Amino acid sequence: MTSSGKVRIYELSKDLGLENKDVLDAAEKLSIAAKSHSSSISDAEAGKIRSLLGKGGNGAKPAAAAPAKPAPGKAILSVKKAAPATPSKPTPAVSKPVAKPVAAKPVVTKPAAAVKPQAAPKPPAAATPKPVISKPAPALVKAAAAPARPTAAKPVPRPAAAKPQVVSKPAAGKPKLVSKPKATAKPTAPTPRPTPARPTPRPAGAGSPARPTPGQGQPKPQIIRSGAPSRPGAPTRAGAPAKPGAPSRPTPRPELVGKPVPRRPAGTGVPQRQGGPSRPGAPTRQGRPGMPPRSGNTLELVGKPIRRDGSTTGSGRPGAPTRPGAPGRPGMPAGMRKPVAPGELMQLQKPVGRPAAPAPRRPDAPTKAGAGAGTATPPVARPNSPSAPRRPSFRPGGPGGQRRPGRPDWDDSARLDALRSRSPQKQRQKVHIIGENDDSLAAQTGGFAGEQENMVLSASLARPAKPKSQQRTAPKPVAAMRKRKKETARQRQRRRAMELRAAREAKQVRPEMIVVPEDNLTVQELADMLSVESSEIIKSLFFKGIIATVTQTLDMPTIEAVADEFGVPVLQDDVEEAAKKTVEMIEEADKAHLIRRPPVVTVMGHVDHGKTSLLDAIRQARVAAGEAGGITQHIGAYQVEIEHNNEQRKLTFLDTPGHEAFTAMRARGTKVTDVAVLVVAADDGVRPQTLEAISHARAAEVPIVVAINKIDKEGSSPERVKQELSEQNLLAEDWGGDVVMVPVSAIKGENIDKLLEMLLLVTEVEDLQANPDRLARGTVIEAHLDKAKGPVATLLVQNGTLKTGDVLAAGPVLGKVRAMVDDNRQRLKQAGPSFAVEALGFSEVPTAGDEFEVYPDEKSARAVVGDRASDARATRLAQQMASRRVSLTAMSGQANDGELKELNLILKADVQGSVEAILGSLEQLPKDEVQVRVLLSAPGEITETDVDLAAASGAVIVGFNTSMASGAKKAADATGVDVRDYDVIYKLLEDIQMAMEGLLEPELVEEALGEAEVRAVFTIGKSAVAGCYVTTGKLHRNCRVRVHRGKQVVYEGDLDSLRRNKDDVKEVATGFECGVGTDRFANWEEGDRIEAFKMVTQRRKLTT
């Protein structure tokens, strides 16, 4: 039945036990609209069809007034229980409900008689009934509706069992069913088990064993003819939801006379479990041979049952033969049938029109209500499909599991019904737990029914054989796989070759830096240094317009360009030469007066790796905080006194810049040092300036102590730094090498004492000595022009003692020491070996890196200075001419063409080292289109003379960490001279490069506007107009257009006319049509593509 109170044709046919065709014919006679077996009809129409088919016959149902009398030997007897009649909406019934009902035994009622409640009789100790068949009366009795399933909340009270009333009507040759109550059991009705899938409530008696209460009699069983089953208002099954509101259908029932005679031996039943929980829809466990007797009434069949041909069998189908082994005997387990003769079959039914197959239950579950102790299991017929989803009751293969026994084994419709009844979500087979009483099941499955069921189960589980076509084509995928395997073999060879090539490239790690000796290399030598193939170098040169072979020599600019393309910086050999110690400070006469001197330690490393912060931690000062941009841009000299082996020892530290522009400074620092401290950040590793510092230290042949800084920072990895340094042949002591590596933290001050101790140990091995009793010799570390003090130089005394008033010569500069101060700004009278001081009294700013020497008198000093000044002047002129890199012919040609651009600069810086660093960086800027002319470069402040020179030559004054003298700013404002001051070298170089680019003429570039497609051509007089559709962008009037026809450009010029709907417009956007016309082109064709663009100016960039 559908959820809206309607019945489908196929459900009605199953209820009536007829074919769908018979029901459709009956509906057609009654003018009821029903097209097919799945059509739905109302309950009233279903009642009309039932009445017609009941009167008409077909052997389905006897008429209500005159029931058909079956022929002798043709009737099938069935013991039927009285169903508890409390659905969710109970239908009117004859019986009176009781507040707490018990499960009723089937009673034999006279159709016209009313059913009265009666106490349940005591169940007998053990018996199998012998039924006595009585002829049914023509009167009708209304059957109660099938009970509904319980909800999870509370059970619904059920009616009391009906009082049996036996009416005898003798019939010759028919057996009698004799029943005698024996004992009364006292089980407690269990709590109904909720079922989530079925919300409709079911009385507690449904699915529960018959447990009569004391003081109540047990009803007697009744015999109902299978040909006339009782029909409730709505066809329901045991455990299915009740359909409220459906009218009940009266059904004539035969009566029982007498009491049942015990036939089976005692001990064949299974004792009823008391209080066990029942599962709704679980089958009743029947008695088994060899088991203790089951309490309750038993029935005994006396005489031969009567069969009638064409009558409705237990399955509800007319004419269907009775299935052998159907569960019709008490004591037989559900699903296990004893093979008997076909004529001796007896079907036990419930008093419902559509009996349903109960689902299998657990072995320990009690019997269902209405199937009292010792009563026969009702026949299992195929239920109609309910509207709500239900639990499938078909359990193949499980012990005690029931097949759908309403149809014979050879009927395939039984399997089809089983498949249809399963919903896709519930097709998983549920495991049935075998209890202790199921041991005898195996012995009962060997009969005809067991063999038939096993055969059906095996057939249902068997895998179908593969078609011959699939078996024939099975080898084809193997062949295809073999074919693909051959193809992948060639691909594997190519992949292996690529992997080998990649492995070779991985092994040939490109260096971080290369050093070029003598300013030239051959192509093969450059390829070996860069760890690339020589063909890659030749290809790179070819793209630069240079045809070269592997033996061709390349000059320095070409080498730098190629190396820069591969990402490797180039270090010239002369820079490394600057780090070599060329002058021996200790002479032969000093060896008799040598004493130990403090070591000079130079701190080197990459920019921002913490060199100055490490020195601050050693000196307990904050020099790094005062550095512009946080980076060191000049050399600082400091002296630290520490305690070692219970004596005070001194260390002189030189702090060098880490920026790439200060290569010469690092070389000078390395030249005068005794030990190089290489600072490497633990979170950054080895960087280009780190490698450069390593090369400087090796060129100066000084030992290296590695300080792995920033170990407190997240992501630091000292082991990774050691690994990278090992690739540069710096192997740590704990790795089996000879290089001291100390992890430190400059911020937190970790391991600073250990680093100092290691420095002293290394310098003790070097045995550093000097003669303090001679005239001083040393090196100019740094020099600058102080506006108050004049030229100031930082001097490192390497041998002898420098005193106030000494006359010295520093390169071409003559000086007389007027005063000396140390790093703490304390004035000194003298400075011994390895002492760094700032000295005043030079005639001009000396050049950083020059050696100084003290002479006994001023005359000898001036003679030496004069010779050096002449040499320095010649060298300076040569450098200025070389910086031009432009011949007179080239200059005149560029001037005539208007391509010669010059940028004049006047450079003033704080110290000499900064001047040479800036000049070195300017040399590396591209000079093909703009020349940089440095008219003046010197340390010191910007003076009024500098402003006058800049005004006369049109130069820009660039100051670096310096200030302006009095009157210079006023003069600059009056003459309009641009004065720039910087404190970070990055910003200075960027601004100079942008100024050079500003001198270049801007270039014109195309800017795309849109495209249009010519869809029509209109001739207007002698000219033609193209009807276009704008596909992308916009078309602007007076813009440039390019007409494409296929792959050729047929016209390029201005767009003179642009119209839309005969109106002149300035622009047409995407998706609109327009007319395009040009004065110089009229040869338009359909399909032409118009490209619109405009010319815009763009700032040019410097190119190398």
Swiss-Prot record:
Give positions of region: Disordered.
51-444, 461-497
Q: Which GO terms describe its molecular function?
A: GTP binding; GTPase activity; translation initiation factor activity
User: What protein is this chain from?
Assistant: Translation initiation factor IF-2
Q: Where is this region: G5?
A: 745-747
What are the start and end residues of every segment in region (G2)?
630-634
Q: Does the keyword Protein biosynthesis apply?
A: yes
Tell me what organism the protein belongs to: Synechococcus sp. (strain CC9605)
Q: Where is this region: G3?
A: 655-658
The residue ranges crossing the membrane are none
Record function comment? One of the essential components for the initiation of protein synthesis. Protects formylmethionyl-tRNA from spontaneous hydrolysis and promotes its binding to the 30S ribosomal subunits. Also involved in the hydrolysis of GTP during the formation of the 70S ribosomal complex.
Which is one Pfam family of this protein? GTP_EFTU
Q: What is its main location?
A: cytoplasm
Q: Where in the cell is it found?
A: Cytoplasm
